[in-house]
């Protein structure tokens, strides 16, 4: 059985790209959220094995959502995804509990490598 993954990104194109990479590699995408508030609600409902989380989103950003999910489940596995390879953002995300960080545009092998590392 494949691992269940929740994709969080406000850009439909990015969600679609990640979903395509994941499904081709045997992962099951159980949900997609377009903002941080939706991400927290779906995480609690779906209990995925892993979350890919964009940082810059409307309503609630990815780092705030990351902190809220970690408050609900301290062992939650979350990988941050962002076009901003800004050092401060990466440090904030890791300090808040993110397990890894992927910079857009994604390379399929890097996405899979990060997910396998976090799930192992």
Across the structure, where does each feature detected by a protein language model lie?
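C-terminal output helix
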Residues: 88, 106-115
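Active-site beta3 strand of CheY-like receiver
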Residues: 46-52
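Two-component/phosphorelay signaling modules centered on CheY-like receiver
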Residues: 12-31
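Short, conserved "switch-loop" micro-motifs in signal-transduction and mechanochemical regulators
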Residues: 84-85
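Acidic catalytic/metal-coordinating carboxylates
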Residues: 35-38, 61-64
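Receiver (REC) domain active-site loop signature in two-component systems and cognate sites
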Residues: 57
């Amino acid at each position: 059985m494949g691992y269940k993954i929740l994709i969080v990104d406000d850009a439909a194109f990015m969600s679609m790209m990640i979903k395509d990479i994941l499904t081709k590699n045997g992962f099951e995408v159980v949900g997609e959220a377009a903002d941080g508030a939706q991400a927290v609600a779906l995480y609690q409902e779906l209990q995925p094995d892993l979350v890919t989380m964009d940082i810059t989103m409307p309503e609630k950003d990815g780092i705030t959502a990351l902190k809220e999910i970690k408050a609900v489940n301290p062992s939650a596995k979350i990988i941050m995804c962002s076009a901003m390879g800004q050092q401060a953002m990466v440090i904030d995300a890791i300090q808040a509990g993110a397990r890894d960080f992927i910079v857009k545009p994604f390379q399929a092998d890097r996405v899979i490598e990060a997910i396998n590392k976090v799930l192992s």
